[in-house]
Amino acid sequence: MFYQDPFDVIIIGGGHAGTEAAMAAARMGQQTLLLTHNIDTLGQMSCNPAIGGIGKGHLVKEVDALGGLMAKAIDQAGIQFRILNASKGPAVRATRAQADRVLYRQAVRTALENQPNLMIFQQAVEDLIVENDRVVGAVTQMGLKFRAKAVVLTVGTFLDGKIHIGLDNYSGGRAGDPPSIPLSRRLRELPLRVSRLKTGTPPRIDARTIDFSVLAQQHGDNPMPVFSFMGNASQHPQQVPCYITHTNEKTHDVIRNNLDRSPMYAGVIEGIGPRYCPSIEDKVMRFADRNQHQIFLEPEGLTSNEIYPNGISTSLPFDVQMQIVRSMQGMENAKIVRPGYAIEYDFFDPRDLKPTLESKFIHGLFFAGQINGTTGYEEAAAQGLLAGLNAARLSADKERWAPARSQAYLGVLVDDLCTLGTKEPYRMFTSRAEYRLMLREDNADLRLTEMGRELGLVDDERWARFNEKLENIERERQRLKSTWVTPSAESADEVNAHLTTPLSREASGEDLLRRPEMTYAQLTSLAAFAPALEDEQAAEQVEIQVKYEGYIARQQDEIEKQLRNENTLLPATLDYRQVSGLSNEVIAKLNDHKPASIGQASRISGVTPAAISILLVWLKKQGMLRRSA
């Protein structure tokens, strides 16, 4: 039977991608349905209890700048906040927070349940309704049919999921949840390329059985950072420390002696695991010269006794897991409350997607999260927001949107996936972005909030705060430009006390701030340049914009040159065998990837600059050379 009311957008799956997709579509005014197998696990942190980190924190800030949920949720649930790379330049600084799993899940569910235009329904989805290569709805396990103009798949590791502990395995979407086998079979019937990936999680430890007195503590930062541009530290719950222990030779011997019982090394697992979050088995074998590995003992929440031992993800048998855990300092009497495991699951080749995350083959069908080959809550959330907003725009018959690589880490993420694909779980790093000086955490709102407002994602409160911040930045920069001090002035001595080279000529506040030894706080503590801005976010922007002005201008020039290639479009139906002068390898790769632009084509491995030149000449001769607006 059909549900009585049609929807504009259906989201299938209630993890980090699904919740952002649902919130985005509903915020844009579209009637949105979120289908989940269990309402109680909306926003569940299936693996590590943390948000952010290098590259990942940048994505969270971008999601927030577009009006998303993740940053707000972690500000309400974070029990330890830190700035990573705090001593380095602003481009690579990143925020990370330990999370209370229960508080995080509660924050997400509360936001969803209070979002207008959004209905949540608990039923597993077993089928899609596809008519003439166009998705028009979904079917649940009890045969209930829902119609919609667009469908977003955010099903995580549930598609034909298989859990491995030692040489034993069983079907599961994650521990305690069933897999989605009928939907997996249905998707395999569609013209989509599918493969298998693997991820894993460590055993959870009873905190009452750990001797923390012999372990080093790791505390959060003070003052505490915040994730959301709309947040403040007063929202944070009680803060707690993490602890550090290490593996040792005994640990490594236990692992080496039991590799024949590892499903990975016994050939039972075929899926490829994450390169940058390897299992402890992989670490011991790949880094055989290391006699120890650092392990972070992270609390799972303020009301939980469970500890997440970050660094010992494993699928070895339970008895071996016990030996591994008890071989480490402070853990000699530790008890495991949940075993570690590996999980294999289906993912679909993201090269079959447009940069909007819509399928190239099924109109109105969008993919986001681990189904696209990524790993991590943050990568999933960013994709979910993009897929949700584009599903909403499709249902409203509006032009879709995707950020450029020069505009956002989300743009880098989507371009990497859709252009290059992935053979292993993809994780975001700052090193993946060629314009990372422009793509900082601190300016995510300056880069994206205006676009978010145009798209209908940003509410009035955020928009007003954003404009207030812009005005504060502009006003303060003008004040510093127009405030001067001369070497003969009475205030010169106070200024010189902060300089390595005394003033030799008249200088403005901006001139002084450009000096590496002068901070904004120091400058505005001087009588001649006081007072400091009360708006701390605006003050941070003033300092960064002034100090890095020359570098930023050079990078902007590079971006403008690159945009000429990005905006040179390639026909979707072009058969590259027609282009004389291209090698067979280049022809095969271009026909396989079907790049949307010269810029995308240039990033395909094996497509040389010479091949790009040949292609540009051919397009011009054929009268097919055109650029997007």
UniProtKB/Swiss-Prot annotation:
Highest rank taxon of the organism: Bacteria
Residues annotated to bind NAD(+): 273-287
Residue sites binding FAD per the record: 13-18, 125, 180, 370
Single Gene Ontology BP annotation: tRNA wobble uridine modification
InterPro entries assigned: FAD/NAD-bd_sf, GIDA_C_N, MnmG, MnmG-rel, MnmG-rel_CS, MnmG_C, MnmG_C_subdom, MnmG_C_subdom_sf
Names of required cofactors: FAD
Molecular function in Gene Ontology: flavin adenine dinucleotide binding
Location(s) in or outside the cell: Cytoplasm
Primary localization class, coarse: cytoplasm
Assigned keywords, A-Z: Cytoplasm, FAD, Flavoprotein, NAD, tRNA processing
GO CC, any one term: cytosol
Assembly: Homodimer. Heterotetramer of two MnmE and two MnmG subunits.
Summary of the function given for this chain in its UniProt record: NAD-binding protein involved in the addition of a carboxymethylaminomethyl (cmnm) group at the wobble position (U34) of certain tRNAs, forming tRNA-cmnm(5)s(2)U34.
Annotated family: Belongs to the MnmG family.
PANTHER family: GLUCOSE INHIBITED DIVISION PROTEIN A (PTHR11806), PROTEIN MTO1 HOMOLOG, MITOCHONDRIAL (PTHR11806:SF0)
NCBIfam families: mnmG_gidA
Protein's name according to its UniProt entry: tRNA uridine 5-carboxymethylaminomethyl modification enzyme MnmG
Chain's gene name: mnmG
